[in-house]
C-alpha cells in the first residue's frame, strides 16, 4: 500500500482525493496538532466540558457515545457547537460489526443518530466487505444530508495484547479500503500499512490516513491488556494522528496534558517530514 507519510499535512491536503481527509489535514496544519483525544467519560456534562477545555489543542475528539448515561439532543448540539468553536472533527468509535442492513440503521437512524454529528466512524471487516459497502451506500445516497463531510476508518489493527487483527485480516482491510476510496479515509492501525500485501491495485493518488490508538506518555500498559506507545514512536511508525485517552483526560491537569501531547506529536511529525 502506498504511503505519503513523508509529505507535510498541507501538501497532502492539497492533493488528497477525499474531501474529508483534506479537511482533516487542514485542521491539523492550522492548529499544529495531530492529537485525537479519546473522551471516555460517562456524562454529557463531562464530555462537553472536556471538549471545550481541550478543543484548542486537538484535531479530533473521539467518542464512545454509547457509554454516556444521559445521551440526548443536548449532547449532539453541544458537540457540534464546540466542533465549530474550536475547529476539530468528531470521531465516533462505534466499531460497527454486523450485517450491512443492520449497520445502515445503526449509523443513520436509531437512538444515537450517529450520522448527524460524527464526521468519522469506524468498522471492523470481520463481517466481510458488505459492511463497508453498506455504510458507503448510506453516506453517498442522494438524500443523505451530510455528503462529503462523512468518512470511514477501517479497524485494521488493535493495540490490545493478543489482538487477532493481524496478518490476513489486516491485508483484507487494505483490499477493501481500496475499493471504496471516496468513503474510506484510512485505518486505525499501529503503523503505516505501506508494506502490507494487497490483491487490489492502488488508485492514483492513494493516501490513506493512519490513526494510532494507545498513545500514552506515562504508562506502557494496563491490567486489561492495553499496550501503549509514545507520540514519537507512534508517529515514527506511520501514525498521522495519535489517539490518547487516559493519558490526557485522567491526568491531574488535562489541559496541560493535551498541550504536552500536542507539542510532542507535532515535533514527531516535523521530524518525520524533515521539517526540523
Curated annotation (Swiss-Prot):
InterPro entries according to UniProt: Aldolase_TIM, OMPdecase, OMPdecase_AS, OMPdeCOase_dom, RibuloseP-bd_barrel
Organism superkingdom: Eukaryota
Protein name per its UniProtKB record: Orotidine 5'-phosphate decarboxylase
NCBIfam families attached to this UniProt entry: pyrF (TIGR01740)
Originating gene: pyrG
GO-annotated molecular function: orotidine-5'-phosphate decarboxylase activity
GO biological process, one term: 'de novo' UMP biosynthetic process
Catalytic activity: orotidine 5'-phosphate + H(+) = UMP + CO2
Keyword Protein transport: no
Residues that, per the record, bind substrate: 40, 62-64, 93-102, 228, 246
Gene3D superfamilies reported for this sequence: Aldolase class I
Enzyme class: lyase
Active site: 95 (proton donor)
Family according to the record: Belongs to the OMP decarboxylase family.
Any single GO CC term annotated in Swiss-Prot or TrEMBL for this entry: cytosol
Pathway(s) of this molecule: Pyrimidine metabolism; UMP biosynthesis via de novo pathway; UMP from orotate: step 2/2
Pfam families for this protein: OMPdecase
Keywords recorded for this protein, A-Z: Decarboxylase, Lyase, Pyrimidine biosynthesis
Annotated EC: 4.1.1.23
Amino acid at each position: 500500500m502506498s504511503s505519503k507519510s513523508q509529505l507535510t499535512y498541507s501538501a497532502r491536503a492539497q492533493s488528497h482525493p477525499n474531501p474529508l481527509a483534506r479537511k482533516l489535514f487542514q485542521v491539523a496544519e492550522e492548529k499544529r496538532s495531530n492529537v485525537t483525544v479519546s473522551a471516555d467519560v460517562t456524562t454529557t456534562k463531562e464530555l462537553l466540558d472536556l471538549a471545550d477545555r481541550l478543543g484548542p489543542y486537538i484535531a479530533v475528539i473521539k467518542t464512545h457515545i454509547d457509554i454516556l448515561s444521559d445521551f440526548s439532543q443536548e449532547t449532539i448540539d453541544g458537540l457540534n457547537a464546540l466542533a465549530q468553536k474550536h475547529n476539530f472533527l468528531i470521531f465516533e468509535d462505534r466499531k460497527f460489526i454486523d450485517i450491512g442492513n443492520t449497520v445502515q440503521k445503526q449509523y443513520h437512524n436509531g437512538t444515537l443518530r450517529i450520522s448527524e454529528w460524527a464526521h468519522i466512524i469506524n468498522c471492523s471487516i470481520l463481517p466481510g466487505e458488505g459492511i463497508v459497502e453498506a455504510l458507503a451506500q448510506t453516506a453517498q445516497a442522494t438524500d443523505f444530508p451530510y455528503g462529503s463531510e462523512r468518512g470511514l476508518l477501517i479497524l485494521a489493527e488493535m493495540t490490545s495484547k493478543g489482538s487477532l487483527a493481524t496478518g490476513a485480516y489486516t491485508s483484507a482491510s487494505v483490499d477493501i479500503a481500496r475499493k471504496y476510496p471516496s468513503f474510506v479515509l484510512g485505518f486505525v492501525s499501529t503503523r503505516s500499512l505501506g508494506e502490507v500485501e494487497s490483491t487490489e491495485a492502488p488508485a492514483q493518488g492513494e493516501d490513506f490516513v493512519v490513526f494510532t490508538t494507545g498513545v500514552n506518555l506515562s504508562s506502557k500498559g494496563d491490567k486489561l491488556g492495553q499496550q501503549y506507545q509514545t507520540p514519537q514512536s507512534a508517529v515514527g511508525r506511520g501514525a498521522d494522528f495519535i489517539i490518547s485517552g487516559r493519558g490526557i483526560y485522567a491526568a491531574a491537569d488535562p489541559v496541560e496534558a493535551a498541550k504536552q501531547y500536542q507539542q510532542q506529536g507535532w515535533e514527531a511529525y516535523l521530524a518525520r517530514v524533515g521539517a526540523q
